[in-house]
Amino acid sequence: MESPVVEGNSGEVATPTLPQPPTPVSSNIRVVCRVRPLTELEKGRNEHSIVHFFDSKSISIRANGPQFTFDRIFGYQETQSQIFEDVAEPIVNDFLDGYHGTIIAYGQTASGKTFTMVGDPDSHGIIPRVIESIFVGISKMREKDTSLSLAFCLKISALELYNEKLYDLYDASKSNLNIREHKQNGIYVEGISEIVITSIEEAYNFLNISNNNRAIASTKMSAASSRSHSVLMIELSQQNLSMESSKISKLFLVDLAGSERAHKTGAEGDRMQEAKNINLSLSALGKVINALTCGANYVPYRDSKLTRVLQDSLGGNSKTSLIINCSPSNNNEHETITTLQFGTRAKTIKNQPKINKKITYHELELFIIKLAKDLEKSRKECEEITRSKNLEINNLLIQLENNQKMVVESNQKLELLNSQISSNHSFDNTFKEIENTCENSKIIFDDLNDHINNNNNVDENNNTNNNDNNNNDNNNNNQYQEESNQYQQENNQKDGDQNNSSFDSIKVEDLRDLDDEPDIEDIILNSTLGNISDDDDDDDDHHSNNNNVDDNNNGEINNDSDGYLNRSLKDIKIPEISDLNDHNINNNNNNNNNINNDNNSNSGGLRVSTSYITSSPNLSPSKSMDVNNSPPLFSYFKTKDFPPSSDENDKFFNDLIAKGENEQQQQQQQHNDDDEDIKSTTSNATTTTITTIDMNASHPSGIDDPIEFTIIKSDKTITSTIERETIQPSSLSNSTSLLDIETVESSTLPAPPPVTTTTTLTTVTTTKLTKTTNIPSNTNDINSIDDFGFSKIEEEGSSSNRKPNDTAILSFGDDDDEENEDNENEDVIVDSDEDTHSGKNNLLNTFKNDHHRGDFGATPTKSIFNKNGNITIKEFETPQQQQQQQQQQQQQQQQQQQQQQPLILQTTSTNPTIISIKSNKEPSPSSSTTTSIKKKNFNKRRSWIIFTIILTITLVSSSLLCLYLPEYKERLVQRRGYLNKLGIYSDYPTNEKISLAQHNQISLAKELYGGNSKQYYDEMSSFNTAYNHLIEMNHLETAVSKIFGSAIDLRFSGDDVINSIECKRAIHKLKTNNYVNGDLDQQQQQHNYITKIDQLSEQSKEQNQLIENFKLDLKNKTSEIEKLEKEIKQKDNKIKEKEEKIELIESRVLNEEKGGEKVLEDQIISLRNDKNTLSTQILNLEGDKKSLGVLVIKLNSDKTEIQNEVKELKRKVQELEDAPIALIPNPFVKWVKSFYVEKKSWFVENIYKIWNWFK
């Protein structure tokens, strides 16, 4: 098959061309002439031959007649085999290649047409030899087809044209048939019988039936004269299954009735009517020949049914050979000349033969793919071209922009130069004016000097005083200038220090009472790290200098200095003492090195407000938390125009610093006194360790700090010791160095450090604190917990309305149950860390900040709880503190009425802690939760049970289909039958292809038979049946492939997988089960096949040897025949010479005596006798040759049969080789098969149900 893609030598794909059918090649009709010998009847009428042969291509009537030239001329001696080899064999070869072919025998009555086409039993004509040659050619093509992809279908039909009516020679009941024309298939006869033949015997049987039905009658010129035109049509369909291509070729073998004259044939009645119709159709044939020869615009094919049938053979798509049969008798001279003239005209006709091959879908797909590749390639080339052009355009645009910029710059430079030139001109003018002014001033100065010198003696005292005043003024001006420059330098230096120094962000907490609003304000004080004392000294120096200036300078200078100072003092930002006292700043430190750490601990968990005392334009957080570089507690940076400080400012700052130090000392003294009290109390207590919880000090998520709880019990005192690790201040410097406004407002502060129990934040990593708390006898004193901010945990109402047993409950998750079980009978009471607000605020801020922020990851809550999860925290303060607490309680109760919602705390464990106030019992899971869990588990189990049932049903159905489906070969035979019916040549087409083929076949049948004919409905029903069966088989194969694909782990994907050989073999093996039962039988059968193949191969060798021997004998015989023919020709020449001599002698005999005539007659008789003997010898040799030819044909047929048997045996052996090795029979499989056989009817019924379910 021609491929639409052509590759050159370089491997590049050439430009694709649209796949076209083979182009026709113009060729003339081949015309040969055959002259029969004189018949016995003609010899009896003393008729003689008037035909003269010049060579193998020229002939003339009489010696001096015109010559007729043809492609080949056959004389009296040429045999049937020679005619076939020269005329018919090339047509048959082209017919096998896919061309249409036609062989026509034309001539007068009794000229030998039927003998040439049909022959007799002893000497076969062209038709039987053509059939034999076709089968031989098909067998050769099958031998060359190693892939077994070629399929052949040979159909044969016969018709006759009798009295201008078409009859079916095979089925005599079909008469008066109609001629149709198809766009692709050409001319065809509607309703004619087409018989598929598979062997030569079937073809011979068809020919015998057709010849018996032909119209034959006896006339004066022929005892068995054909009274009709007969046409034998042979159609060959060749299908290449691998390439999905097909070729359809037709061969027409035409035996025309002879033209005749009524007075010669003696036709009367019906014979006369037959002769008229014959002559009419032959005359129409002559008109067509003339029209084709002359190149007329219109060819009268429709004048006769004969020319209509032969339309493709004459000037159409066919390779045509015309045999003109002539009679040598002088009685038929006119008819012979007419026949020769007909042949001369016919050989000028040109046909357009071509291979009748259809363009396949595969070729079109390849062509489309090639076009798509070329399109993609051209698209990429266009993209590259456009990309390169765009780059060039972009480069040009960039160059243009650069040029424009250069032009603009050059214009600017020109303008600048022009402006400079103009300024130079103006400067020159100004300079000239100044020079003139100087010259004038010199003149005036000289005049003044002269005037002063003249009055020097008169104004001496005045000049002395004036000089003193001028000196003082100059000194004052110089001093003032120096001070101003120095002050400017110092201001510049301060500005640089402010830009380069770092500012601490001191977080001052507004420690309101516990009953205040939940929003707690923090004030950020930005302080400089500069030295205030040095600045003050510098300011004092400035003041002293200014005072000196005031004493020495005049009043204007003093006024200017005072104005400057007054203007600068307006920018001083000094907070009032009352404002600072309202913030209750408490740093809880012993020294100034831990200020930042103390601020961090106090601010943990509080929400920071956005109000600032002042702001700095340049903040450097890198050193803000550095302990060694910490500034004083309150320091205010100076603005850019900060003037020298006054005494009041110095006094204010000194008082403020002294007050902070005094407060620190008082707090330290208070703390030391508390420590002594605690130590004295712990000596009378007994210590019991409850439990130890190991936690990580670095605060990763989900892990707590290591805390050791120790309960010291006595009669009325409980001492709690809390040991935990603190965090180095240096580790907090980067995380809490400085907070900006946006961070504070969005409440996304960094995690504050853990709650610590230390009162002095030094670099020591572990500290211990113990405190003694007196337990009152009255349980109502538990209300003192409100001082720690736990009033939010309680229910509505004041502390007076609370019940004695109401406690705050911390509800923990399941993770804490195990720890609680170890402490079943112990209630732990946690006391406060410190006396000051620092420790209390830490715990309070933890609860409040978590509650207000809504997130629980910042500060882990450390609490001690009993077995029920109840936390009890008691605190007893001094009377002063209790009075403050009562005020706080009233405000907190008001807040409780507005905010009543459970508080959620987050511990470092995985489960959050919920504080409940309604009961002291641990919450238990609800019944609805348990029911939902059970439902989920039941749903899971139910889905698994359903899946198991479906899997079991699938496996059972697949095993049943395995046992009861028909074998693969049977289904393949059925499938191929249906596919051939629809004209499909692939074994596994898709459903779309099947539907399309059905539609095409039905439309073709409608065109052939008509929409209302019975044949059309029969064909349509058969097409529908084939379509339904094929669709059903496709569904079955798909279902089986899916089942077996899941069983044997093959990848099935519809028709593509089913078409694969591995899938076919797997399905075949699974369904036939040959590998279970047939191990020994297969081996024995395979051995028998091999031995039989060996025997047949030996027989074929012997047969080949016999054939070779016969061929050698045949060659020897033919050589002998050729020698005899040469001798006969020589003797014929001698006879001719002697005949000429006899004629001369006869002419002389008339003048000679009777005695001389007798002698000549005797010589003539002897010569004739010799000729007769030679002719008999020739006939004998020809008979031997025919018998040898028949024997050779028979041997060839035997050889082909043997070869077919060998192929069949090889195929079976190949199937046996492909079959898997037999497995060991399984007794379980035998039991299952016996069980299935017993329950066969039940299983068959279920199989049909399963099959319907699959459908």
From Swiss-Prot:
One of its GO terms (biological process) is microtubule-based movement. GO terms for molecular function: ATP binding; ATP hydrolysis activity; microtubule binding; plus-end-directed microtubule motor activity. It is a single-pass membrane protein. Residues 454-491, 545-563, 583-603, 915-932 have a biased composition (Low complexity). Its main location: nucleus. It is found in: Nucleus membrane; Cytoplasm, Cytoskeleton. Residues 1-26, 454-503, 530-564, 579-628, 661-686, 795-864, 915-934 are annotated as: Disordered. Residues 608-628 have a biased composition (Polar residues). ATP binds at residues 107-114. One of its GO terms (cellular component) is microtubule. Pfam families: Kinesin (PF00225). Residues 1088-1223 form a coiled coil. Induction: During the developmental stage with highest levels detectable between 12 and 16 hours of development. It comes from the Eukaryota. Disruption phenotype: Kif7-null cells have a problem in the localization or differentiation of prestalk cells in a kif7-null/wild type mixed aggregate. SMART domains: KISc. Residues 813-834 have a biased composition (Acidic residues). InterPro entries: Kinesin-like_fam, Kinesin_motor_CS, Kinesin_motor_dom, Kinesin_motor_dom_sf, P-loop_NTPase. The chain crosses the membrane at residues 945-965. Keywords: ATP-binding, Coiled coil, Cytoplasm, Cytoskeleton, Membrane, Microtubule, Motor protein, Nucleotide-binding, Nucleus, Transmembrane, Transmembrane helix, Transport. Residues 28-349 form the Kinesin motor domain. Belongs to the TRAFAC class myosin-kinesin ATPase superfamily. Kinesin family. Microtubule-associated force-producing protein that plays a role in organelle transport. Its motor activity is directed toward the microtubule's plus end. May be involved in cell motility or cell differentiation during prestalk formation. This is Kinesin-related protein 7.
